[in-house]
Swiss-Prot record:
Function: RNA-binding component of the eukaryotic translation initiation factor 3 (eIF-3) complex, which is involved in protein synthesis of a specialized repertoire of mRNAs and, together with other initiation factors, stimulates binding of mRNA and methionyl-tRNAi to the 40S ribosome. The eIF-3 complex specifically targets and initiates translation of a subset of mRNAs involved in cell proliferation.
Biological-process GO terms, alphabetical: formation of cytoplasmic translation initiation complex; translation reinitiation
Stored Gene3D superfamilies: 1.25.40.860, UVR domain (4.10.860.10)
Protein name per UniProt: Eukaryotic translation initiation factor 3 subunit A
Family: Belongs to the eIF-3 subunit A family.
Region (Disordered): 114-133, 828-1061
PANTHER family with a match to the protein in the record: EUKARYOTIC TRANSLATION INITIATION FACTOR 3 SUBUNIT A (PTHR14005:SF0), EUKARYOTIC TRANSLATION INITIATION FACTOR 3, THETA SUBUNIT (PTHR14005)
Species: Chaetomium globosum (strain ATCC 6205 / CBS 148.51 / DSM 1962 / NBRC 6347 / NRRL 1970) (Soil fungus)
One Gene Ontology term, aspect cellular component: eukaryotic 43S preinitiation complex
Superkingdom, taxonomy of origin: Eukaryota
Amino acid sequence: MPPPPHQKPENVLKRAHELIGVNQAPAALTLLHEHITSKRSRNVPIASLEPVMVLLVEQAVEQKKGKLAKDALYQYKNIAQNTNVGTIELVLKKFIELAAEKVTAAQQKADEVQSSIEATTGSSSVEDLEASETPESILLATVSGEQSKDRTDRAIVTPWLKFLWEAYRTVLDILRNNARLELLYQSTAMQAFDFCLKYARKTEFRRLCELLRNHVQTAAKYSAQMHAINLNDPDTLQRHLETRFQQLNVAVELELWQEAFRSVEDIHTLLSLSKRPAKNIMMANYYEKLTRIFLVGENYLFHAAAWSRYYNLLRQSAAMLATGQSKKSDSPPVSEADLQKAATFVVLSALSIPVISTSRSRGAMVDFDEARKNKNSRLTHLLGLSQAPTRSSLFRDVLSKALLRRASPQIRDLYNILEVDFHPLSICQKISPILAQVGADEEMQKYILPLQQVILTRLFQQLSQVYETVDLEFVQSLAQFPEPFQVTRGTIEKFIMNGNKKGDLAIRMDHATGVLSFDVDVFSSAKAVHAGSAAGSAENESGSVQRLQSTPSQIVRSQLTRLAEVLYTTCRYIDPSFNEARINARDAVLARAKAGAEKEHLEILSRKEVIQKRKDKASEIQAQKEKELARKKMLQEQALQQAEAQRLAEEQKIREQKRMAAEREEIKKKEVEGMLKDMKLDDVELEDLDNLDSNKIRMIKLQQLEREKNTIAEKLRVTGKRLDHLERAFRKEEAKKLPEDYAKQRERDIAAYELIKAQTLKEAELKHKEDVELKHRLTRLMPFYESFRADLHERRRDMFEKRRRDAERELEKQVTLRRKEYRERKLREKREREEKERALREAEERAEREKEEEKQRQEARKEELARLREEREKERERAKEAQARQQQREEEAMARRRAEKAAAAAVPIREREPFAATGSGPRLPLAGTKSTWREREAAKAAGGGAPSDSGPPPARAAPPPIERTDSRDRPAAGPPRLALAGNKPSWREREAAKNAAGGAPPPERSGPPPRVASGRGEPMDRAGSGRGGDRDARDNNGPAPEPLKASGGPGKYVPKFRREG
């Protein structure tokens, strides 16, 4: 079955509106979807396809058909992305706007429903005021009353929220990894973040973050595709950074700390790819969010490090703004209050870092330590630090940058109490008012608990140095904090147990007596734990705890060390050989070091050179690889662009051809429709228009004209007949009323005339009176007018005369100037005319000279040709003379040969039998059987006359070999004759033989008769042909011919020496 015919977008749009008008919106949506997803729609102009897509989006949103909209949007993006990106942005924005409007409308509807429910509940009458609250009503209110709003939202708002979320995800999937649509992609991601924040959609926010993360990975993987985004582009990377910072802000606002931390990692990854440094305002936001993330995760060490980085950035931004090195828009707003607040939090967060280990257990395994190291390394990289921070390094940084002077006074006092002059017995009394001030601040209140842990750690560490046992009540009295931060006994016990578990404390507690016993085992190695348990703490740092005195266990642990030191000192002072051996060993070591220092230095230098060469070579290889990859990528992109351009050109050409064909068809159809409309043929269906051609339309038109002509003629006949009777009746009745009507009309005309006449006379009289009054009033002003006019004329006369004289002078000046210009122009024209005449005359003279020269050259050429002609004539005469001499020599040679032949003919030969006696047939004229004229002439010369027929013919000698003629012996004209043996003599030879014989007829021979072609009759008479007879007659009648010259034809062989003589 053939596919259905493809409809135009205008017809599809019209049909869809018709379906929507009759409440068939699903059918309209299906029609629009099928048209968009059809393969034939790829060649349709985008301008006509855009309204179809907009209507499809509207209907898809109305009917919640997200999948249909997604499919159509993907297809529309593939169609329009290479020609018009703006239409894609328009359709996608429309899609999101409609979905957002639906969510807003659903929210308003839910609010209205909830308010109506509350109003109905509030206005309901209560039957019994004393028993208004029944058990049933309480249960119903508990189960359904408080949840009514949630149920309303789930029923009305949630479906549209889900649809809007799907719309955002669809649009982001369509726009991903496309450089042309990158701006819309970023703005859509921002709108999606605002959607998650506005409606507190935490689950959707996690999915959105994962979706954007996958998009970035896909972009890096498929970077070679056409129109793919380039993360190495600074602008593209900057836009992705802005999106990730917005993601971080929303994650913090929603308190999704895990997503916030992953967003921080994403930002750090993008920052590592960026070639340009990030803006200070963005980095300030980055570090500020890190402080909140680390505080929630109770990682106080990196929390303090983040505050330190934040303070350094603020101070750097302030310095750059003061020197003008940075724009105000690129830097965070920095004031003295901001710096003081940041310094306060740096010190407070550093004080809150736990002194002891924060690990969960003492027996940390190696794998756990490795994982912890990796985590600390990641966090260090996130903060941009070269090494992991420590509590002591942070305090050194605080002291080196004088943050204590900038911090608030209470935090400065807190630092002095905890780190400078810590005293366990008076610590709580000194620190209570400070903790009260810190607890009053909402932002600082979060540091109370870690500060308590630090205070308790220091308290127990110093108590263990002084006491062996201590009462728990005494410890509780020492650890007195202000309300509501009071520490209970259970808290202290829990702290002691955690410290023992992690190996930082060695305390035994007797619950029966309430006594705490510090570890007095002199061989205890509680502190000898691996360094991994101290990560993020300061228990292994010297000076972290103020040392009051050494404990017995510390004395026992250091006993061997002290013994070794004492023995070494004793030996050094008592035994001289010990010192000598030590000095000799040291000198030997120094000598060896000095001897090998130069060599080691050279080896180090050579190793450095080798390393540097290898680095340079590796960098060159890497640069070449990158250059080659860039070149290949560029060539690939160029090839793709060319292929794409060619494809687009072909598609455009095909679309243009189809469009023109469609336009022609449409014009033809409209012309047919217009003709049918002019003919008022409403019974022709639209489907029949394609079957109508010009002949059919002409026939229809002729038939229509014939019908109209007949109809009009019939109507005219009927109407004329009716009008004739009616007009006759009207005139009969009118003739009776005409006199009366005439009299009435005359009276009306006279009355109107009298009325107009009276009005005209009255108006003329009034106007005359007004004019007379005006004349009398103006007459009184005439003397003043005349005097003013005379004064004005006097004043203006002088001015007029002055202007007239000035005008005359100006006129004379202009006339003189014009005359001067006219003379100059005439002179210039005369000079130009003379110059042209001179140039023309020179051209004519030059042409004449050239003509004379050409004539002389032609005459010289003619003289040269005449001279050459004379030379050729002379050459030709010389050639003729040479030829004549050559002919004379040849004749002489021929005469000698004839004499030789005549002498040879006198020798007797065998007599031949006559032809008649043999009785055989005529002898064939074979080669060598017939004598030539030279032979006959030689025979005559030898015999003295013609031989008789009765006598036997002389014997013929064998034909001599054919003489070879060279190219110089050829005749002057024509190719050389073939020298064949026994050829028949030519007519010239025969004529020469006649002349030599004195005109006598040829002798009769007893031999065979002359050869006559059998069956040919008599020989041809050539008398009138000019080829033989006439010439014979002329030769016979004229003077005796000159001796014949050698013709250059074939003959007997003549030796060379005879030819020369």
